[in-house]
C-alpha cells in the first residue's frame, strides 16, 4: 500500500507551496465566510464551541473492485482534490492486494453544523476522486462527502477497459437530503391493501439479496435501473437521508424505518403490480434517496449489518409497515417520524424502539424476517470462537478458503471443523479487510458478511 502526499507527487502532479498555501487560504476563508452566517441562531446542540474559525477533520477509506468479477483491484491510483478545485491534487493513494487504500484524514466543516437543525451552512466537505488502474476504464467521482469525526467509505467499481476506448466514467454526487432541497414524500397508507385478483404478494417476509432501484420517478422512462445488494442499498439510503454524526440509537431508528419501508415495497411487489420492472425508486417523493456511487460511513455500515434482517410490525399485520418520515424542519409530517426529531430524542438517551414508538405509536414492534435470500446457511445463534467445533466451523473455514483466493491478505485455513488460532487469525484479517471489529470471533455481523462475500466470489468463480 502506498500513499503519496501532494508534496511528493512526480512530474505532472506536483503542487507548489504557493498552490498549497492558496488552497488552504481559500478553504479557511470560505469556512470563515460560511460560518459567520446564522451561527448565533444555532440551538439544540448542547454546550457548543465557537465554530466561526474552526475546521475539523473526517476520515476516508477507498475500496476498489472489478464490476465484472467483484474481485479487489490492486494497484489502483486515486487522486483526491477538493470538488471546487479539481485540478489541484491533495492526496494520491494506491490500493493494496485487498483493493483498499490507507485511511486518511481530510478537512471537514465543524461537527456542530451537522447537529443543528437550524444550520444553513453545508456541514460536510466535498472531494473529487479520480481513479485509474491498469486494464480498467478510469472513473471519476465528484462529491464524496466528508463529515467531521466520521470515517467515510467510498466503494468504487471499475469496468475492464475495451480496446481503443479512452473514455472516463463520471459520477456527480448530488447534495445530502438534509442540506439540499428535494421533493417531499407523497403520503401513502402505511399498510397496503391486498385484494386484487392476480396481484403478486409474497407469502412471507424475505430479505432479498438484491433489489432493483429505478434512479428517478416511476414514470421516468429515461432513468436507469440498478441491481443493488439489499444491505448496500440500505447503507446508501441511510447515508443520504441522515448524518452519520448523529447518536447511534437515532441511526438505528432511522435504519429500521428505512428497512421496513423497503421491505414493504418488496413484500407487496408494489411497483411490479403497477406494471413496472423495478422494486423501488430513488425519488424522495415516492421512496427514499438513493445515489449511485455515493460514499457511506463506517458507523452506519456496522449498524445496518447489525439490523439488516429486521423490520417494523404492528399486531396482526403480516406485511412490513411502510414507515414514512420527513426531516421535521423544512417539512412537517404528523404521524410520521421526523429525522431531526429522532436526533433530539437520541440526544436525550432514547433507545431505537422508544424513538420509533414516540412517532409511530406504542404498538410498533421490531420483527425479524423469516428468510434471508442468497446465503448458504443461517446464523447459528451463538458466537463461534477458539474452541468451537462442528459443521458450522467447517463451513466457515471452507468459505474463508474460497474468499482468500480473491483476497490474498486473508490466510487460507484447513477445513477441519476446529476453531483454532489459525482460524481466528483468518477471521481477524477478514474483519480488517471488510471494516468489522477485529475480534477474531464470528458474531452475527461477521457470519453474514462472510456469507455475502463468499457468495459473490464463488458465484463468479463458477462462471469462469
What is each model feature region?
Residues 55-57, 61-74, 83-85:
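Structural motif
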Residues 56, 72-74, 89, 125, ...:
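Short loop/turn segments at connectors of secondary-structure elements within structured domains
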Residues 53, 69, 118-120:
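Short consensus segments that form the blades of beta-propeller domains
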Amino acid at each position: 500500500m502506498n500513499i503519496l502526499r501532494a508534496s511528493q507527487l512526480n512530474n505532472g502532479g506536483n503542487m507548489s507551496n504557493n498552490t498549497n498555501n492558496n488552497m488552504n487560504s481559500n478553504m479557511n476563508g470560505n469556512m470563515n465566510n460560511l460560518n459567520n452566517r446564522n451561527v448565533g441562531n444555532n440551538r439544540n446542540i448542547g454546550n457548543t464551541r465557537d465554530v466561526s474559525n474552526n475546521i475539523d477533520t473526517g476520515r476516508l477509506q477507498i475500496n476498489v473492485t472489478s464490476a465484472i468479477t467483484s474481485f479487489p483491484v490492486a494497484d489502483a491510483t486515486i487522486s483526491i482534490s477538493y470538488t471546487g478545485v479539481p485540478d489541484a491534487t491533495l492526496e494520491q493513494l494506491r490500493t493494496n492486494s485487498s483493493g483498499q487504500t490507507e485511511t486518511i484524514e481530510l478537512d471537514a466543516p465543524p461537527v456542530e453544523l451537522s447537529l443543528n437543525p437550524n444550520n444553513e451552512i453545508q456541514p460536510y466537505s466535498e472531494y473529487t476522486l479520480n481513479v485509474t488502474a491498469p486494464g480498467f476504464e478510469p472513473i471519476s467521482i465528484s462529491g464524496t462527502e466528508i463529515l467531521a469525526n466520521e470515517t467515510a467509505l467510498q466503494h468504487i467499481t471499475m469496468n475492464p477497459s475495451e480496446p481503443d476506448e479512452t473514455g472516463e466514467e463520471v459520477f456527480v454526487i448530488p447534495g445530502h437530503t438534509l442540506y439540499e432541497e428535494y421533493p417531499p414524500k407523497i403520503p401513502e397508507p402505511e399498510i397496503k391493501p391486498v385484494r386484487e385478483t392476480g396481484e403478486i404478494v409474497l407469502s412471507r417476509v424475505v430479505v432479498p439479496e438484491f433489489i432493483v432501484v429505478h434512479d428517478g420517478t416511476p414514470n421516468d422512462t429515461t432513468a436507469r435501473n440498478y441491481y443493488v445488494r439489499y444491505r448496500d442499498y440500505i447503507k446508501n439510503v441511510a447515508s443520504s437521508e441522515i448524518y452519520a454524526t448523529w447518536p447511534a440509537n437515532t441511526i438505528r431508528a432511522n435504519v429500521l424505518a428505512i428497512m421496513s419501508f423497503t421491505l414493504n415495497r418488496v413484500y407487496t411487489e408494489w411497483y411490479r403490480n403497477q406494471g413496472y420492472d423495478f422494486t423501488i425508486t430513488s425519488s424522495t417523493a415516492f421512496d427514499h434517496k438513493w445515489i449511485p456511487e455515493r460514499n457511506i460511513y463506517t458507523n452506519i455500515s456496522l449498524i445496518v449489518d447489525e439490523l439488516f434482517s429486521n423490520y417494523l410490525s404492528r399486531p396482526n399485520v403480516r406485511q412490513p409497515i411502510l414507515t414514512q418520515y420527513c426531516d421535521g424542519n423544512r417539512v412537517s409530517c404528523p404521524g410520521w417520524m421526523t429525522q431531526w426529531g429522532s436526533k433530539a430524542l437520541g440526544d436525550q438517551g432514547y433507545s431505537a424502539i422508544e424513538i420509533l414508538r414516540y412517532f409511530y405509536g406504542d404498538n410498533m414492534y421490531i420483527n425479524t424476517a423469516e428468510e434471508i435470500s442468497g446465503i448458504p446457511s443461517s446464523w447459528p445463534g451463538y458466537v463461534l470462537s477458539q474452541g468451537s467445533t462442528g459443521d458450522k466451523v467447517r463451513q466457515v473455514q471452507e468459505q474463508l478458503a474460497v474468499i482468500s483466493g480473491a483476497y490474498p491478505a486473508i490466510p487460507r485455513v484447513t477445513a477441519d471443523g476446529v476453531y483454532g488460532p489459525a482460524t481466528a487469525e483468518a477471521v481477524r484479517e477478514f474483519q480488517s479487510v471488510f471494516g468489522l471489529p477485529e475480534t477474531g470471533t464470528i458474531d452475527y455481523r461477521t457470519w453474514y458478511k462472510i456469507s455475502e462475500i463468499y457468495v459473490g466470489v464463488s458465484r463468479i468463480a463458477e462462471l469462469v
